[in-house]
Amino acid sequence: MKIARYQSAAGAERLGIVTAASGREFLVDVAKAAAVRGGPTTPASVMALIEGGAAAMDATRDLLRWAADRQDPLWLDDPNTVEWLTPVPEKSIFCAGRNFGRHKLESMKGNADNASKLHSDFPTGFIKLGRTLVPHKSQVKRPDDVLDFDYEVEIALVIGKAIDARRDIDPASAIFGYTIFNDLSAREWQLREMQNGMIMLGKNFPGFGPIGPYILTADAVPDPKALVLWLKVNGELRQHSDCRDLIFGFAEMVAFWSRFGLVPGDLISTGTPEGVALHHKPDPREWYLKPGDRVEAGIDGIGVLETFIV
């Protein structure tokens, strides 16, 4: 099931589920369809769906079957015209760093021996503030003092139930679904910060976290390692990889960061594959983002996250 969070013309948050009608994809507005059908209660928001567990999912699937059979324009919204929101309300995101093997290797300038020595026992990363997250089709301003403006397509895991290091819970079962994340980065600031062993400002300028548009529920992904992610700038392919190149897998990241105590709606991002501008040869400046660029970040089976640089 593919889930969307968007808002109506009046500004109200809507929960939408993707369905096909007349050869096109539409969003079933869950609240509107439920109001017409009546009967069993269905979640009114993305967070209610996530927190409601299996019962909420079953009720939503039942409503989707009912609505899809009728295809009434009253509850069908066009994804090309809605105003998107981030897939979950404002949440900070735990971001893994150097977690794809080939990206880790390119970051060490091809030195496999040095690359193998980097944090091989557990995932490391940083926190991206919730206020940086922006939805599908957002315009993101390149900061005035940033020229080395980079992209990083990633998969963000959406946590579906509370989990911490004290609970005997299968980490994979805590994953509600997957969405697309673009970890925009100011490399000048990031590299200066990394000289002091930290990353903060270089990852946390306003708008540096495009995310969405959909959450694909975990039950629709039988083999997460087969997920393919890619990124294009102005139609040019820059990044492409499947998740078999991950160093720490989805469940391993959830298990490790559950030490924080994860709750429904929390986000964990995988890190990015090779192909970032920072390591482009011969000159990274040829690939850094600039005003006027259109960035498409995609995950096969989930969709495309579009961002415009201004």
Which residues are covered by each model-predicted region?
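N-terminal non-catalytic cap/leader segment that marks the start of a structured domain
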Residues: 1-119, 294
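A generic local secondary-structure boundary/capping motif
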Residues: 4-5, 83-85, 113-116, 140-149, ...
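Short, structured patches in soluble enzyme cores that scaffold and shape functional sites
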Residues: 7, 128-130, 137, 144, ...
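Catalytic-pocket segment enriched in acidic/His residues
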Residues: 12-13, 57-61, 77, 83, ...
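Residue "hotspots" at secondary-structure boundaries inside conserved domains
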Residues: 86, 92, 147-149, 260, ...
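A short secondary-structure junction signal
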Residues: 105-108, 136-139, 144, 166-171, ...
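A gly/proline- and charged-residue-enriched helix-loop-helix capping module
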Residues: 116-137
